[in-house]
């Protein structure tokens, strides 16, 4: 039996708040949540680790060089059929957050989302966070 990683690599995103940029973004999001929370009707949760596939995986790399090398070693097609632009992503290196909705059956015919979260809370949290970052 041969075991290897066969899918493309989508880097995990972790925001521990170690840098000034990370702290500023986290503070802006937390402040935005406090503004929106009274009208949210549901609990708004924050997580410092986002384990799902996201386009934000192309904005920062949280893994060190040894972890990336271990991944490449365990992907037989790495460098042949697939490469991940780690060096270019490290040049971008911006803190990211995923302010998103929730629902059921994502990307399926039966997909549905919580309308208040999707069309009210998410835009308002995003707006408030950006406003704080730019002020």
Roles of regions detected by a PLM:
Residues 1-135:
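An extended, acidic, His-containing surface patch that forms the Zn2+-binding/catalytic region
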């Amino acid at each position: 039996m041969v075991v290897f990683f066969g899918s493309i690599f989508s880097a995990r995103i972790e925001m521990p708040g170690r840098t000034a940029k990370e702290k500023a973004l986290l503070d802006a999001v937390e402040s935005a949540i406090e503004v929106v929370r009274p009208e949210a009707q549901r609990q708004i949760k924050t997580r410092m680790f986002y384990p799902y596939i996201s386009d934000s995986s192309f904005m920062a790399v949280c893994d060190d060089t040894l972890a990336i090398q271990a991944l490449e070693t365990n992907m037989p097609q790495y460098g042949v059929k697939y490469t991940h632009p780690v060096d270019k992503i490290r040049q971008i290196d911006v803190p990211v957050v995923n302010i998103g909705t929730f629902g059921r059956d994502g990307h399926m015919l039966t997909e549905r989302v919580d309308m208040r979260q999707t069309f009210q809370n998410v835009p308002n949290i995003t707006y408030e966070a950006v406003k704080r970052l730019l002020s």
